Regions:
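P-loop NTPase catalytic core of nucleic-acid-dependent motor ATPases
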Residues: 1-55
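Generic recognition of flexible, low-complexity loop/linker segments
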Residues: 13-17, 74-81, 113-116, 133-136
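Residue-level preference for the first positions of well-ordered beta-strands
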Residues: 24-28, 89, 124
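Short acidic, S/G/P-rich loop/turn micro-motifs used as interaction or catalytic elements
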Residues: 33-36, 95-101, 131-135, 154-155
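AAA+/P-loop NTPase substrate/partner-engagement loops
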Residues: 43-101
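Short secondary-structure boundary/capping segments
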Residues: 44-47, 104-109, 137-146
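Feature primarily recognizes SF3-like P-loop helicase cores of small DNA viruses
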Residues: 80-89, 119-123, 133-297
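Conserved catalytic/switch belt of AAA+ P-loop NTPases
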Residues: 97-122
């Protein structure tokens, strides 16, 4: 989030081929409902000092047009990102699950590609969604998004307590830390001898210097790095894919055949992908008619 105003400048550091596409403009916080994604976005909004509102607009609230609203919303997002000279991130809550199929996927690809040829910098788009299986989307889409999985639901029995804690945190925070971060990161951008091509898991680690700055904050506060502090680029898309297969095995173990691995020391599980489509029926009215075999194979 703190790095979002600098994404355009970081992308300019990569001029060979289409390297810039490995630095996504779209950050997606996904996961199950009730896990606090919207509250997280509201807190980050206040930390960045973007607006005085205490609620981020949802996707359905971006435009008032009642006719062809979905199309008008996509056009508005395109305009904000490609036509306005702005580096403040666009924060949007509750993207619908079907956004990442068809037109929404095309929007992400088009904006990511066109941003390379823009005269001015392109802002980042940060959103939340309850959509599942985003990590299993096409490689072209996965490359253009930064997916963070937030699947820990709050205990409904402690709703009052968690609400009080949220209000307590929200009222205390301000944009002071972000303003300091902007100064520190700007200095790094002005250093000609810095190597920006750090890699993590065969992907460009565009958040490398962000983590370095936050390490400085922990040193200043004389606090050890917590166990949850990431030491490399987070890849929740891979984690999400593993969860998908785990859920499939738990729900339909009969689809899998356990065989002994030829080189591995442990057994492996095989599945006939066509069996996934056995009970699949395409809906004339549904927006997602992707066969299960395609979802899992990707």
């Amino acid at each position: 989030m703190f790095t979002s105003p600098f994404i355009g400048e970081i992308r300019e550091k990569f001029t060979l081929g289409n390297e810039a596409l490995d630095i996504p403009l779209f950050a997606i916080v996904g996961g199950t409902g009730g896990s606090g994604k919207s509250n997280l976005l509201n807190i980050l909004n206040k930390m960045l000092g973007l607006t005085t509102d205490n609620k981020i607009p949802t996707y359905n609230e971006l435009v008032d047009n009642d006719t062809r609203k979905d199309s008008a919303t996509r056009q508005q997002i395109r305009y904000w990102m490609l036509n306005e000279d702005n580096v403040a991130p666009l924060l949007v809550d509750e993207l619908p699950s079907d956004f990442f199929n068809g037109k929404g996927e095309d929007l992400i690809k088009d904006i990511s590609n066109q941003a390379e040829n823009q005269i001015h910098l392109t802002p980042a788009f940060i959103c939340t969604t309850n959509a599942e299986a985003i990590g299993s989307k096409s490689e072209a889409l996965s490359r253009r998004i930064y997916y963070l999985l937030n699947d820990r639901k709050f205990d409904s029995q402690r709703r009052a307590e968690t609400t009080d804690r949220y209000i307590e945190v929200y009222e205390k925070i301000n944009s002071g830390l972000f303003r300091d971060f902007v100064l520190r990161f700007s200095k790094k951008l002005m250093q000609d001898d810095l190597n920006w091509k750090h890699c993590s898991g065969n992907k460009l680690d565009f958040l490398y210097y962000t983590r370095e700055i936050f390490k400085e904050y922990f040193e200043i506060a004389e606090i050890e790095l917590p166990d949850f502090f990431p030491l490399s680029r987070v890849d929740d898309a891979t984690k999400n894919n593993m969860l998908m297969w785990r859920k499939l095995y738990i729900g339909s173990p009969e689809l899998f055949k356990e065989v002994k691995g030829e080189q591995e020391e442990r057994n492996i599980y095989m599945i006939k992908m066509s069996e996934l489509d056995h009970n699949f029926q395409s809906s004339r009215y549904g927006v997602d008619n992707t066969k299960p075999s395609k979802v899992y194979s990707e």
